[in-house]
């Protein structure tokens, strides 16, 4: 891809219907405007956009892409106009903006609007490259920055609108020759109009020139008085409106107070009657329970072996924003959770089941947590890694780790691995210090998933899983996937498992590296995976955008249970001593056990 503002002409420039500007996008996401009120903005792509970036409803590049309840992406306007999905015929309801697709579209290169003109086909909203115009190609997301300062932008002479239209690059030369330069004191009555030479001569004899300081001071005072009067008018109007509202509220309160006293009297009588009835019912229930206990004591209890079912045993509440990561410190029965509220909470999972402490230090969303020894490492959208001492729960070091958010962390062999945009950094752990050992490159997108198992590091990015030898830090194998970016990875004794952006879970044989199965069932991005292994079986847990957790038996590759207790997307998982912890966008952490 060429850099922004690089002169380039494409012989196969593609003309498509114009996209809306960013400001119009935000307005039209709230209001639905008729077609005739839209003015097409010139848009000519330098190269043919990918078909994956085109809406299946309007067949054009996405405009304000959104994800619908069926899991597909459409233009917001198309999704609001259409009733059913063209792929699976499901009802269309907008769920959330598709930020990832919007960012990809913003990276596409287009021709400057001042280098385009209407195509000769006569179709409205269709444009082609103008060889006489601006030669630059720019990223779609940066078009405003370039076009606002483009030398080919049409401008008007500031001296006289009757001057012929100009290009910005010709304005300075025109001003030197313009015959319509007015005296700076024209607003006070000076009638002079001339060119640059006569303008300078006129100023020497202009009767207003000697009074310019006095005139300016007078203008300033008039302006201040006008502003003060406007403010007073606003204050008077506000006070009048408040006075009217207060009068209305007082009248309403008087009326409602009388009604509430009447209702209160009625409720007191009714509560007294209900209380007597509840006491009678409680007495009857106690008698029945005593009778049932007596009958049970006369019998013999038999054994019952139910199917292993996970149930929600409790909920940790305290975060003020979505929970994005979880980590368990088994030696102390502590659970750490990172959130959009920029904090890390420490939960006791053994005795009190309460928040022990809230760790503060990050300036952005906490996206990743990892434990090595007695140290907790946290990665954030503020591009830093903070080192915490678990013994006293204090911050001991802060490292500026990446130029972009730190998405994931994992430790192995006394090294810490951190994932960000197109890079994995390897850090030697030396006490409380992190020494950069190497940066692993050659990655095609965000690294959102890292797992260390035995002597290998597994990293997930866009449709790719790379396997690295931890001892040599060399990439020894690449697994190709489908379904968009890899958001989660888990490794069992026999399988490599990954969750993707487009709802899928792929499974590979760990020895042959051959894909053996694709697990389906989720209807949203698979954000997290976790494994619980016993001598008898291995279970994989998946957490998804669709607010559910699924339990998969790796013996027969089927879903044995679906857990639905969260009120938002489930984003993080952690396991400890047969227990499963799940964090979600609803700001809670839930505990699951058999």
Curated annotation (Swiss-Prot):
A zinc finger (RING-type) spans 55-89. PROSITE patterns: WD_REPEATS_1 (PS00678), WD_REPEATS_2 (PS50082), WD_REPEATS_REGION (PS50294), ZF_RING_1 (PS00518), ZF_RING_2 (PS50089), ZF_TRAF (PS50145). GO terms for molecular function: ubiquitin-protein transferase activity; zinc ion binding. InterPro entries: G-protein_beta_WD-40_rep (IPR020472), WD40/YVTN_repeat-like_dom_sf (IPR015943), WD40_repeat_CS (IPR019775), WD40_repeat_dom_sf (IPR036322), WD40_rpt (IPR001680), Znf-RING_euk (IPR027370), Znf_RING (IPR001841), Znf_RING/FYVE/PHD (IPR013083). GO terms for cellular component: cytoplasmic vesicle; cytosol; nucleus; perinuclear region of cytoplasm; ubiquitin ligase complex. Pathway: Protein modification; protein ubiquitination. It is an enzyme of class 2 (transferase). Residues 1-33 are annotated as: Disordered. Its EC number is 2.3.2.-, 2.3.2.27. CDD domains: mRING-HC-C3HC3D_TRAF7, WD40. Coiled coil: none annotated. Disruption phenotype: Brain-specific TRAF7 deletion ameliorates neuronal injury and abnormal behavior in traumatic brain injury (tbi) mice. Mechanistically, attenuates neuronal death in cortex and hippocampus through reducing Caspase-3/CASP3 cleavage. Ubiquitously expressed. Expression is relatively high in heart, liver, kidney, testis, prostate, thyroid, and salivary gland. WD repeats lie at residues 318-357, 361-398, 401-437, 439-478, 481-518, 521-562, 565-593. It comes from the Eukaryota. It holds the Pfam family WD40. A zinc finger (TRAF-type) spans 146-216. Keywords: Apoptosis, Cytoplasm, Cytoplasmic vesicle, Metal-binding, Nucleus, Phosphoprotein, Repeat, Transcription, Transcription regulation, Transferase, Ubl conjugation, Ubl conjugation pathway, WD repeat, Zinc, Zinc-finger. Belongs to the WD repeat TRAF7 family. This is E3 ubiquitin-protein ligase TRAF7. It comes from Mus musculus (Mouse). The lineage of its organism: Eukaryota, Metazoa, Chordata, Craniata, Vertebrata.
